From Swiss-Prot:
Name this protein carries in UniProt: Probable cytosol aminopeptidase
Membrane-crossing residue ranges in chain numbering: none
Sequence similarity: Belongs to the peptidase M17 family.
GO molecular function annotations of the record: manganese ion binding; metalloaminopeptidase activity
Originating gene: pepA
Pfam family of the protein (one): Peptidase_M17
Annotated function: Presumably involved in the processing and regular turnover of intracellular proteins. Catalyzes the removal of unsubstituted N-terminal amino acids from various peptides.
Active-site feature positions: K267, R341
PANTHER family: CYTOSOL AMINOPEPTIDASE, LEUCINE AMINOPEPTIDASE-RELATED
InterPro entries per UniProt: Leucine_aapep/pepB, Macro_dom-like, Peptidase_M17_C, Peptidase_M17_leu_NH2_pept, Peptidase_M17_N
BP terms from Gene Ontology: proteolysis
EC code: 3.4.11.1, 3.4.11.10
Length: 490
């Protein structure tokens, strides 16, 4: 993880060769002039040649332009269309810029006049962009250094450090989520995922584990039906952060299918390797709880994750089975690859009954249909509460994690009615992301609830400004921002 140090020293001192990143909204100002002077005019010449105007997406890279400067990267931050520079624009610019650095372990980042208040946001973008899941690479090149330390030049170190503390916490939550999603399924399965969660007790979180026996006694028939085909036994893990006195908790629920073969309704071989990511909702919840604990959030929050592996075997659940959920409702299982909703059915109803939360937000890589609807830029938002949906959407916009609210209603809900049980776990293909949400809604009662379908945003095959290809950690920052509005001091 990239180490961030806020320093008040001049960014362009020539005491040692230094790589410098400058985030700017114009090719002018005192900071730009100081860098140009240190480079003996090389910066201004390059800017003129490239037509750099400080616009978002623009960059200039100069290798060793002068003594004392090993590299210079200029990155524009000014949004197109005349919009004001904001934290998201700074994060994205910093993320792009640090990726342009070549072969350095340490760099200085500075911001042009009027942008210094965004220095912690720049550090966040740089840290998230520099993430690399390299745990299993045995041949790591020693000839190509990787950026390890970023010195961020500011005039008020104390103010920057104060604001960075919360961003540091959430960045570690995002990285934890990315790490969990990236792990191979032979390493991360319900028992080992549980062990990773239990390590968070050292942050002050309370962790409770329900094993197969406990869930059987409680009547988690829907979740246990999914798990019965695997040699890896299921777990439900409850993580609590108590920072809000006697207030009712906010509850966050995650789907944790550590590998999804589809069960007897088996998936095609192509792309099945990515089904290790089907625990992305649970990973996001755990990353969030880590962030709340690290920044000592003034709120009561509960994270509940249902952890299973959906496999094919002689003991696997069959299409046509009927299972009884925790709350007593019966479900006709017509497709064993629609398993995430079965896991969430028990976890949602259990959380509602046991903890009486103020609200519930569940996250799941639930449907391929949401990817068809929204692509890879926005997660689907379904809710029974306009106020909750609005709060989540505003939080997402603030941190650059987009949500798009989808319709719900009785016309969709009745498609789930079964002839021989209370409901079936699938309807027709049209609107199937909505039908999945309607299924979940049957288990939340009158509690304010939202479902985030993150199937298109939890894992990407192309890099973004602040995330390499692979696990994104989508949702941790969004929910952390959402929680802030509910804290005691808010």
């Amino acid at each position: 993880m990239l180490s961030v140090i806020f320093d008040s020293f001049p960014a362009f001192s020539a005491d040692a060769p230094r790589a410098v990143v400058l985030l700017c909204d114009a090719a002018s100002g005192e900071t730009f002039a100081a860098l140009d002077k240190a480079s003996a005019g090389a910066v201004s010449r390059a800017v003129a040649l490239k037509g750099f105007k400080g616009e978002a997406g623009q960059s200039v890279v100069l290798p060793a332009p002068a003594e004392g400067l090993s590299q210079v990267v200029l990155a524009g931050v000014k949004p197109k269309g005349g919009a004001a520079v904001d934290a998201v624009a700074i994060e994205n610019a910093a993320g792009r810029a640090v990726r342009l650095l070549e072969g350095v372990e340490s760099a200085v980042l500075a911001l042009s006049e009027g942008l210094e208040q965004f220095a912690p946001d720049a550090a966040l973008g740089a840290r998230l962009a520099s993430y690399d899941f390299d745990v299993y690479r045995t041949k790591k090149s020693e000839s190509r250094p990787v950026l390890k330390t970023l010195h961020v030049a500011v005039s008020d170190v104390a103010a920057a450090q104060t604001r960075w503390a919360a961003l540091d916490a959430v960045s570690q939550g995002v990285i934890l989520t990315r790490n969990l999603v990236s792990e191979p399924p032979n390493v991360l399965y319900p028992q080992t995922f549980t062990q990773r969660i239990e390590e968070l007790r050292e942050l002050g979180l309370t962790v409770e584990v329900l094993d197969e026996k406990a869930m059987t006694e409680l009547g988690f028939g829907a979740l246990l039906g999914v798990a019965q085909g695997s040699v890896h036994k299921p777990r439900t893990v409850i993580v609590r952060h108590n920072g809000g006195g006697s207030e009712a908790p906010l509850a966050f629920i995650g789907k944790g299918v550590t590998f999804d073969s589809g069960g007897i309704s088996i998936k095609p071989a192509a792309g099945m390797d990515e089904m290790k990511t089907d625990m992305g909702g649970a990973a996001t919840v755990i990353g969030l709880m880590s962030a709340l604990a690290r920044r000592k959030a003034l709120v009561n929050a509960i994270g509940v994750v249902g952890l299973v592996e959906n496999m094919v075997s002689g003991g696997a659940q069959r299409p046509g089975d009927i299972v009884r959920a925790y709350d007593g409702q019966t479900i006709e299982v017509l497709n064993t690859d629609a398993e995430g909703r079965l896991v969430l059915a028990d976890v949602l109803s259990y959380t509602r009954k046991r903890f009486s939360p103020k609200l519930m937000v569940n996250l799941a890589t639930l449907t391929g249909a949401i990817v068809v609807s929204l692509g890879y830029e926005n997660a689907g938002l379904f809710s029974n509460s306009d106020a909750l949906a609005k709060g989540l959407s505003e939080a997402g916009a603030q941190v650059g994690e987009g949500l798009w609210r989808m319709p719900m209603g009785e016309a969709y809900n009745r498609e789930l009615n079964s002839d021989i049980a209370d409901m079936k776990n699938i309807g027709g293909r049209p609107g199937s992301a909505i039908l999945a949400a309607e299924f979940l809604k049957r288990f939340v009662g009158d509690t304010d609830w939202a479902h985030l379908d993150i199937a298109g945003t939890a894992w990407k095959t192309k890099a973004s400004a602040i995330a390499p290809k692979g696990a994104t950690g989508f949702g941790v920052r969004l929910l952390d921002c959402f929680v802030k509005a509910h804290e005691a001091s808010a």
